[in-house]
């Protein structure tokens, strides 16, 4: 029980307002389910002072390479930021810290209501889509059911799953919407994705030799990689990857390249293989066994329901592939050498995220359907802020880029997709 000086109390779970100013507010921590320890924050911000380092269990830059330090400078700054002095980089970092702190100070009930509303809407859409596919032999039901299921899967992966797994909603302390408990509608297990995406890609964004997302070990996506004859297949591999993107990511997350180099043991690989096998079996049973089987029993629509589910997954994969490739591969997004991050400060880390990422311009609906990854620059600066806040901070980030003479890469979806594909074709050649 805690006395309130003013204002009212809103229950985050229900949105209901309780009590009058001056009364007592009671807070309850559920003992029915205990949340595991929060994941270490390796994707957003490092402690700012000696006092904050002493007060947190987060690893420091000195202990964990790839996390930004407080003072110093990298051995070499990237070309796009070579004109900045150490003092300017430090001030830029403080300005971006202030933007983040402002959002954190105002984050609350409306944000919680937003994500719960999206989750409810997505689940109803998925249920409706699967229900229509139970009668998929009728063209109208087939088209509507496939469309609804496609959109539901896109929303679950992009706006919900990806962002929940970044810990954007961990502050709610809701066991059902937490980065340590959420399992998304994607073949690769959540924990595997968090390892390769959160812990590695966001830490080493576009650092050649560190960020495995630069080419995903199958594509040549940077001029510094020596050309080999197999790179002629760049466009073919990328086109084939798009419709089966979730399976490609599941294979990528196994880190077979690290097994070959001895960085990852075969025991670890077998553990990961079992995890992927269990997840893949569940996804296969849900999409390609349960829904078609029920449709066949009820209406004789089993084959049509199977085709509809295959289409929904394929279209989701193509969309996710397109959006993700727009994040770092369009013209204007820089890559970095290891010496450019050796000794980088907090401000330098911010600079790298800004000039190594690319946005997509468009409508509010388009931003939502990309999971707000259309605000890739803002997402890489603040990956643990609610995605619904990126549109709010984007003008401030763009103004900072302009004031410090840094590029802010953005453009319409088709232009960014075309730019990424142009790079795929260009780097297929010597």
Regions picked out by a protein language model, each given a short descriptive name:
Residues 4-16, 20, 26, 53:
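Intrinsically disordered, low-complexity repeat/linker tracts enriched for polar/charged residues
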Residues 18, 38-41:
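Intrinsic-disorder-associated, low-complexity terminal segments enriched in Asp/Asn/His/Tyr and depleted
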Residues 45-48, 66-94, 233-244:
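Short, non-transmembrane cytosolic segments of multipass membrane proteins
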Residues 72-124, 128:
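Low-complexity, highly charged intrinsically disordered N-terminal segments
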Residues 113-157, 232-247, 273-322:
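Alpha-helical bilayer-embedded segments of polytopic membrane proteins, i.e.
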Residues 151-272, 341-428:
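Membrane-embedded catalytic scaffold of the fatty acid hydroxylase/desaturase
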Residues 275, 296-297, 307-345, 425-430:
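Extended hydrophobic/aromatic segments used for targeting, binding, or gating
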């Amino acid at each position: 029980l805690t006395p309130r000086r003013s204002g009212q109390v809103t229950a985050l779970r229900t949105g209901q307002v309780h009590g009058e100013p001056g009364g007592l507010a009671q807070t309850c921590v559920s003992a029915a389910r205990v949340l595991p320890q929060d994941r270490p924050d390796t994707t957003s911000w490092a402690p700012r002072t000696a006092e904050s380092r002493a007060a947190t269990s987060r690893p420091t830059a000195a202990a964990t390479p790839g996390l930004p330090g407080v003072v110093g400078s990298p051995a070499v700054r990237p070309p796009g930021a070579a004109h900045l002095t150490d003092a300017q980089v430090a001030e830029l970092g403080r300005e971006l810290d202030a933007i983040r702190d402002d959002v954190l100070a105002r984050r609350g009930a409306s944000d919680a209501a937003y994500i719960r509303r999206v989750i409810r809407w997505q689940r109803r859409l998925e249920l409706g889509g699967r229900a229509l596919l139970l009668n998929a032999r009728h063209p109208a039901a087939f088209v509507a059911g496939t469309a609804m299921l496609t959109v539901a899967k896109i929303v679950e992966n992009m706006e919900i799953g990806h962002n929940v797994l970044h810990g954007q909603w961990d502050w709610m302390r809701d066991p059902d919407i937490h980065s340590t408990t959420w399992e998304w509608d994607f073949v690769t297990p959540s924990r595997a994705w968090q390892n390769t995406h959160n812990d590695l890609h966001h830490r080493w964004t576009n650092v050649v030799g560190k960020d495995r997302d630069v080419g995903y070990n199958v594509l040549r996506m940077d001029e510094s990689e020596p050309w080999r004859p197999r790179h002629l297949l760049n466009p073919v591999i990328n086109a084939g990857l798009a419709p089966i993107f979730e399976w490609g990511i599941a294979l990528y997350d196994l880190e077979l390249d690290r097994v070959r180099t001895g960085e990852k043991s075969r025991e670890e690989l077998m553990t990961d293989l079992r995890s992927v096998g269990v997840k893949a079996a569940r996804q296969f049973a849900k999409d390609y066994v349960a829904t078609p089987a029920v449709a066949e029993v009820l209406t004789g629509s089993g084959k049509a329901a199977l085709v509809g589910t295959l289409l929904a997954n394929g279209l989701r994969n193509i969309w996710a592939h397109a959006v993700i490739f727009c994040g770092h591969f369009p013209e204007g997004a820089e890559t970095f050498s290891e010496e450019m991050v050796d000794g980088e400060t907090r401000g330098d880390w911010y600079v790298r995220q800004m000039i190594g990422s690319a946005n997509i311009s468009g409508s509010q609906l388009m931003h939502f359907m990309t999971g707000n990854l259309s605000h890739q620059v803002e997402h890489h600066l603040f990956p643990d802020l609610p995605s619904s806040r990126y549109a709010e901070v984007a003008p401030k980030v763009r103004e900072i880029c302009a004031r410090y003479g840094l590029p802010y890469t953005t453009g319409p979806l088709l232009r960014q997709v075309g730019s990424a594909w142009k790079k795929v074709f260009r780097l297929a050649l010597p």
